[in-house]
């Protein structure tokens, strides 16, 4: 059995296959996911699993160079925005929500959580750990 926190085999496989600059999205329950992008749907019900729990677990295995969130999060989900700002520092990049949705088209996968708060989406750009 794995010793790390991330137990979901689909997510773990995607993370293991990411190369430098590849994109992985962690999404709330409402973000549209392009048909051509791998969907890993772990949503059970409203709020379960949460965006934060999912993100923090994925980050136990993923090195991140940049993290992109929608500008709309600043006003519509300020608490989450402040938490992510503290967590990612200057790696956090603010873009428009429409740009974020466009980036999803190039993602290796989108992880759909049960998160039920507005604009709780992040595009993670894989970094290099050496």
Curated annotation (Swiss-Prot):
Subcellular location: Cytoplasm
Binding site for substrate: 28, 97, 119-121
The protein's enzyme class: isomerase
GO cellular component: cytosol
EC number assigned by the record: 5.4.99.62
Catalytic residue positions: 20 (proton donor)
One example GO MF annotation: monosaccharide binding
InterPro entries hit by this protein: D-ribose_pyranase, RbsD-like_sf, RbsD_FucU
Pathway annotation: Carbohydrate metabolism; D-ribose degradation; D-ribose 5-phosphate from beta-D-ribopyranose: step 1/2
UniProt keywords, alphabetically: Carbohydrate metabolism, Cytoplasm, Isomerase
SUPFAM superfamilies named among the record's database cross-references: RbsD-like
Catalytic activity: beta-D-ribopyranose = beta-D-ribofuranose
Keyword Magnesium assigned: no
GO BP annotations listed: D-ribose catabolic process
Function, in words: Catalyzes the interconversion of beta-pyran and beta-furan forms of D-ribose.
Subunit details: Homodecamer.
Protein family membership: Belongs to the RbsD / FucU family. RbsD subfamily.
Protein name according to UniProt: D-ribose pyranase
UniProt lineage: Bacteria, Bacillati, Bacillota, Clostridia, Thermoanaerobacterales
């Amino acid at each position: 059995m794995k010793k790390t926190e991330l137990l979901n085999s689909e997510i773990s496989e995607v993370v293991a296959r990411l190369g430098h600059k590849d994109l992985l999205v962690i999404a709330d329950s409402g973000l549209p996911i392009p048909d051509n992008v791998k969907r890993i749907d772990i949503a059970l019900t409203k709020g379960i699993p949460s965006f934060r729990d999912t993100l923090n677990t994925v980050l136990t295995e993923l090195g991140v160079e940049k993290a992109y969130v929608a500008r709309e999060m600043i006003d519509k989900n300020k608490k989450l925005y402040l938490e992510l700002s503290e967590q990612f520092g200057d790696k956090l990049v603010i873009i428009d929500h429409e740009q974020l949705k466009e980036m999803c088209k190039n993602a290796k996968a989108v992880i759909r959580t049960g998160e039920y708060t507005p604009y709780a989406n992040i595009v993670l750009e894989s970094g290099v750990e050496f």
